[in-house]
Amino acid sequence: MAEKTEKPTAKKLRDAAKKGQTFKARDIVALIVIATGALAAPALVDLTRIAAEFVRIASTGAQPNPGAYAFAWAKLFLRIAAPFVLLCAAAGALPSLVQSRFTLAVESIRFDLTALDPVKGMKRLFSWRSAKDAVKALLYVGVFALTVRVFAGLYHADVFGLFRARPALLGHMWIVLTVRLVLLFLLCALPVLILDAAVEYFLYHRELKMDKHEVKQEYKESEGNHEIKSKRREIHQELLSEEIKANVEQSDFIVANPTHIAIGVYVNPDIVPIPFVSVRETNARALAVIRHAEACGVPVVRNVALARSIYRNSPRRYSFVSHDDIDGVMRVLIWLGEVEAANRGGPPPETRAPTSAEPQARDGVAPPGDACADNAFPDDAPPGAAAPNAGSPDGPAPDGGAPARTGDQNA
C-alpha cells in the first residue's frame, strides 16, 4: 500500500464532512457551554422561588392535593430551569455547527453494522486518539487538584462564612461561590484545552491524508469529466455577447498574450488604412475570444510583447492602433498574406524588402507546422508571431485549398 503523504484536498474534506468526519474540539465546546452556564446561573437560577414555595405550603397548614402539589413543583422547575437549559443548548450547538462548517452529515445518521465490528473496536482502543484521551484525563485530574488548592486559598473565608449567613442569602452565596470555582477551573484548564485541540486537528488531518495515486485519480475525475469540460465551454461562450462575437469574426486576426489578453485587429483600406482595435478583452473573456476565434477560423497570433503594447497604448475598443504599434501590426498582416498566398499556390503579395534584422522566407513557403496546433513558423515570420500551417517544405498544399485560418503563434 502506498504511503499517504499528501494533504487532503478540498473535495476529500467535503466528502468526509458528509460522513460526519469533521474536526471536532469537543472540550472547547464543553468549555463554552460550562462558561455560559456559569455566567448565566446567577441571573437565571433564582433559589428564592423554591424557598417561597416551601413557605407557602407550610403557611397553609392544610393537606395539599398530591396532583396539584406535583404540578406546582413541575411548573416552578420549568420556570427556573428552562431558560438556563435552552441557553446552554444554544451555546453548545453554535460552536459545533461552526466546526462542521454548517454541513449536515446525513450519512452518519444511517444505521451501520460495521460499527459493531470488534476488530475495529480494538483498533480504536489502541489508537493514538485513545492515548491522547488517557493523557488528557490525567492532566484534568492535576488541573482540578490545582484549582481546589487555589480556590481554598482565595475563598476559604467566604466558605466558612456561610455558617453565619442569613437563610435568605444562603442560596445566592452558594451559587456565587460555585460559579467562581467553575470559572477558576476553566481558566486553569485552558492550556490543556488548547493542546487537546491542536492534537485533535493533527490527528484529523492525519486520518484523511491521501497518497499520490488518490490525488491524481481525484484530479482526473474532476478535470477529465466530459460534462465538466462541456459546462466550462458553455461558460466561456456565455462570457461573450453577440456583438463581441461578431467583432471577433470580422477581425483580420487576434493577437493574444497568450491567456490574459486578446486584442482583435481589423483593417479596411477602403475606409482608412490605419488598423483598428475591434476586440479588447482580458482574463476569462480573453480565453473566450481565443476559443471563438479558433472556432471561426480567425488567425490567433500569440505575441506577448505586441499584445501588451496594444493593450497599453489603445485603452479603448473601437480605437485606432497607436503609431508605436502600427509597424508590428503591419508585419503580422503582411506575413499572414504571404502565408495565404503560399497556401493558394500563387505569388506572394507585393511587400517591402525585409531588413537585415528580419529572417528571409525559404522558397516563399513556410515549413510544416506543429501537428497539435496546426501552426507553422515560416522563416519570414515577424518577431513574436507565427502562422497557420502553410503546407509541406517542398511547396504549397497539393489540393490548393483555402488558407488555414487558425493556429498558435509564438514569439
Swiss-Prot record:
Record flagged with keyword Cytoplasm: no
Family matches, as Gene3D superfamilies: 6.10.250.2080, secretion proteins EscU
Protein topology in the membrane: Multi-pass membrane protein
GO cellular-component term (any): plasma membrane
Pfam family membership, one: Bac_export_2
Alphabetized UniProt keyword annotations: Cell membrane, Membrane, Transmembrane, Transmembrane helix, Virulence
Subcellular localization(s) per the UniProt record: Cell membrane
Chain spans, region Disordered: 341-411
GO biological process: protein secretion
InterPro entries cross-referenced by the UniProt entry: BsaZ-like, T3SS_substrate_exporter, T3SS_substrate_exporter_C
Biased composition, class Low complexity, residue ranges: 370-404
Ranges that cross the membrane: 28-48, 80-100, 137-157, 175-195
Family in the record: Belongs to the type III secretion exporter family.
Function, as annotated: Part of the bsa type III secretion system, is involved in the intracellular replication of invading bacteria inside the host cell. Probably necessary for the lysis of the vacuole membrane and escape into the host cell cytoplasm.
Protein name: Secretion apparatus protein BsaZ
Organism in which the protein naturally occurs: Burkholderia pseudomallei (strain 1026b)
Protein's gene: bsaZ
